[in-house]
Amino acid sequence: MAEYDLTTRIAHFLDRHLVFPLLEFLSVKEIYNEKELLQGKLDLLSDTNMVDFAMDVYKNLYSDDIPHALREKRTTVVAQLKQLQAETEPIVKMFEDPETTRQMQSTRDGRMLFDYLADKHGFRQEYLDTLYRYAKFQYECGNYSGAAEYLYFFRVLVPATDRNALSSLWGKLASEILMQNWDAAMEDLTRLKETIDNNSVSSPLQSLQQRTWLIHWSLFVFFNHPKGRDNIIDLFLYQPQYLNAIQTMCPHILRYLTTAVITNKDVRKRRQVLKDLVKVIQQESYTYKDPITEFVECLYVNFDFDGAQKKLRECESVLVNDFFLVACLEDFIENARLFIFETFCRIHQCISINMLADKLNMTPEEAERWIVNLIRNARLDAKIDSKLGHVVMGNNAVSPYQQVIEKTKSLSFRSQMLAMNIEKKLNQNSRSEAPNWAAQDSGFY
């Protein structure tokens, strides 16, 4: 379903290396012409050092021989790599020393570590630039593990004021994402976010741009890390600077926020967050909508159950063709049906199983089994009258006291998030660089 594909929009905020997994996914889904996708890969590869990959793509796209320019570029890249390896070899040997490793693990002070290396191994300031260049070259060649390793060494040693400090954080995050090291990527994402948020030198426009990039890069982490669906809600919905970036620069991100809320495993948090999400979806409905956001609008704004059922069917097609959301399909459908059911039950005391099956896009037998499982798992206070084919709801009236308690809990949660954001703002550190990893040569695609 190319109509709802967001790859082109998202790719504008990603480093070109991060776009390759998205193109591979689209190729498998066959929703675009394969030759167009191959040409897209070739265009992306033109400004990287992954020459062998470019040659393979060229062979698949064209029947003629590999262009001379590509062969020449390969020779140049190999020569540059050998030169950088020779320059970096003495530096790498320093880090391979067991005593250096112990020092790196025991001290968090980059200056102290730098002084130690200078005393013991003759480490010099220019070695940092050499290390950074080599890490970046490794990244451009597609050796992400090497890039991550050298960028870690670089980050440990450089002060926050170094001209490549922020750039190296972007590179480390990209490398960990491309290696699918989700724990390390989550740590790097958190570190990068703190650096951006504490930067008092960047202009508001630069900060907005940095946060917009971070929002898009974070999708890889949030939809693969076990805690990702909690963290994405806290960041996108309850941190005003990031919600503002979404509303200003990339309202299409609401698709991912909505999916994270619907598939969140914490039922209490999910219900609490839904009210705030609905407000944002309503505010932005004039700038962005798709079946996923429209499903929420149909159900919680218009109480249009037929419309919600129709949108849920469309959501399946959207999810299965979305690189980030395809793994959420089962959770989404299951929880969306539960949302429809819960909302429907607030209005009706006695419900026909046939009517319910129609609302949930299930057969009557499937609907009955589904409700039985809900009752068995203590997620539903109801009884089934098999003779009449009815579901009779229990007495779910909420006392005024309970309503006050629930509203207080919600207010407490929001106050806590606000206090955390204020505390972070007060503890600002000055950082001056803009996120330009892979931007000097290849730019953000």
UniProtKB/Swiss-Prot annotation:
Sufficient for interaction with EPAS1: annotated span: 4-128
Signal peptide: none
N-acetylalanine found at: A2
Residue span, PCI domain: 221-398
Region annotated Sufficient for interaction with MCM7, chain positions: 351-445
Location of Phosphotyrosine modifications: Y445
Keyword Phosphoprotein: yes
Function: Component of the eukaryotic translation initiation factor 3 (eIF-3) complex, which is required for several steps in the initiation of protein synthesis. The eIF-3 complex associates with the 40S ribosome and facilitates the recruitment of eIF-1, eIF-1A, eIF-2:GTP:methionyl-tRNAi and eIF-5 to form the 43S pre-initiation complex (43S PIC). The eIF-3 complex stimulates mRNA recruitment to the 43S PIC and scanning of the mRNA for AUG recognition.
Subunit structure: Component of the eukaryotic translation initiation factor 3 (eIF-3) complex, which is composed of 13 subunits: EIF3A, EIF3B, EIF3C, EIF3D, EIF3E, EIF3F, EIF3G, EIF3H, EIF3I, EIF3J, EIF3K, EIF3L and EIF3M. The eIF-3 complex appears to include 3 stable modules: module A is composed of EIF3A, EIF3B, EIF3G and EIF3I; module B is composed of EIF3F, EIF3H, and EIF3M; and module C is composed of EIF3C, EIF3D, EIF3E, EIF3K and EIF3L. EIF3C of module C binds EIF3B of module A and EIF3H of module B, thereby linking the three modules. EIF3J is a labile subunit that binds to the eIF-3 complex via EIF3B.
PANTHER family documented for this protein: EUKARYOTIC TRANSLATION INITIATION FACTOR 3 SUBUNIT E
Stated name of the protein: Eukaryotic translation initiation factor 3 subunit E
Species of the source: Bos taurus
